């Protein structure tokens, strides 16, 4: 069924927009509530699944239901966030439900309370079953299973399934419940009756609102910042949601400069967790990120309008999280939401495809059929992810929704369309550049083009704090260095002895014996970047695969050494981080598949490694590699790197024209040859997996040696090989000129090379798997001091 979804139904299916049209198992009854707020305490079915928009009274209905539960029955409430769990406890106490405990206030490792509120990641601490099981914001709970903070996926998955199968009543609520949630409970509890309650009632606080998508940030009649300044100039208060910390900092600095007299509150992860929103009433401008989400609501009539700055970036909050966060302000006097999407960081290659198409009323059948191929291809690749998710039934069951949420972040039209659907489902009128959604396709094309052409990058914020610029090399080369307990000191500069030990361990495990200690330190410093950590792990595993080490041995080494290896954040070793701290990729199987694919590509291209910058790559080799590996490359690009690309055999000139119009990009030609497509997907793989750029290059006359570095003797040898007379050529300059002219006359095919950091040149081929016991002894701090 999953592979037969029509293109325009994909988002509707996975975000619950078409529940009334679905057919369910015989034990499922469907109820529609359209004239009142949510209520379900009188329903007799053991499983109650509630789909209701924001502001429809889901939590109030839950409280009324809990009041009907016998005091002797045990109740477990599972939340998606710690702050949400705490807010639920407060709401319960205000409504005389005083016998609930909050998991974070229980010191014991194992929890056995009769009535408990717990965040899903701590579910493994629960030691008993419960009569009544509540899953509030169930889609957000499911989303946590894909988070890197979920360190005990297998245990939590097993515990949740056990709790479901042993409960006598279940309540699951969310604004985007889909048919797969209903099917999930039907499969888990086939002997229970289920009530699917679809509530479409929306309070006036939301239904009276209008959302305006702004095409530009500064210039134009509907410029995002222009409207924001106008509101503040009239003495109104505004609330601004920013999807990233970078965009929040940018807007905060901009507003402080333009409105120095306004009271501004900035809430991001830098300021810590947000536990309350009551103080917002004291500010003219409140700027917040997704740290303010479900469980926190501002109910005072204080702000005139809501502004939303969405900085599309891989790893950022998905559109559902954005939608939930922007709904935290329940009342605005002008009933207006202004939204700006900045796609500056996702201007991806031409071959990247949209997953779905927006609800434009004038698509042709031919255009729909083109994007239907994209939709089916997306589903097919998502299904292949089952190989990586064997430790969790929940991750397996809901994987397509997860990949939709992550992949849309890298595609402007998908993000725009999905957010429009979510707003529309909450009865918020959506306007795109003056037109009411759904709009004509030409309007959609024009709008995305304006967003792409007008987007801007952020300048990196400079800090006034100046760090000590001394390096480890300068410290140990200075004769005035002293030892003070566990520290080496030079003035105010300190290095803990454990820092040197960590360098030693790092080399012993991963690097060649002859790598200089100060080069090792440079490598370790770069690993503070998450991208560099990912590249380093990929380079490690590819080297091990190339050496022919047994796969199970590599997996064991990954789990025991790579995954657990810690690196110091600073010289004094006050903080550490994990080498394997990588967003998105949490499965060893994924990394191993990347490594095997990388090794195959390396062999096809005759490279020394996947970060080899010295070897020329012929276009013929790239074409052959793409022909052999295209299906696996495209699968890995989607599943591991959440970048959706179709198979090149399905492309034609009109397909590419349509895709790129949707993305707001303009092609000089309407065609993309197989050669160009092949280069494109190989380039994308190297960039995603190894942060290396595949670029066109002039052929190197001697492999590994640039033209400017050739000696006179080497040039003479090349001229002789090419049968070029050098009778009258005496000087080095004359010889170089003759070589250049001769090269132009020779018929040469296109040549490419990799640009970037050749990290593989430092990596040991076997790690510590087959190293001698004395490896790395030269890295001791004593040796450093003696040198």
Curated annotation (Swiss-Prot):
Cited InterPro entries: Helicase_ATP-bd (IPR014001), P-loop_NTPase (IPR027417), Replication_origin-bd (IPR003450)
Classification via SUPFAM superfamilies: P-loop containing nucleoside triphosphate hydrolases
Keyword line: ATP-binding, DNA replication, DNA-binding, Nucleotide-binding
Binding site for ATP: 52-59
Pfam families cross-referenced by the UniProt entry: Herpes_ori_bp
Organism domain of life: Viruses
Record domain Helicase ATP-binding: where: 39-195
Keyword Oxidoreductase among record annotations: no
GO biological process, one term: DNA replication
GO molecular function (one): ATP binding
Keyword Ribosomal protein: no
General function of this protein: Probably involved in DNA replication. Binds the origin of replication (ori).
Family statement: Belongs to the herpesviridae OriBP family.
Name of the protein described by the UniProt record: Replication origin-binding protein
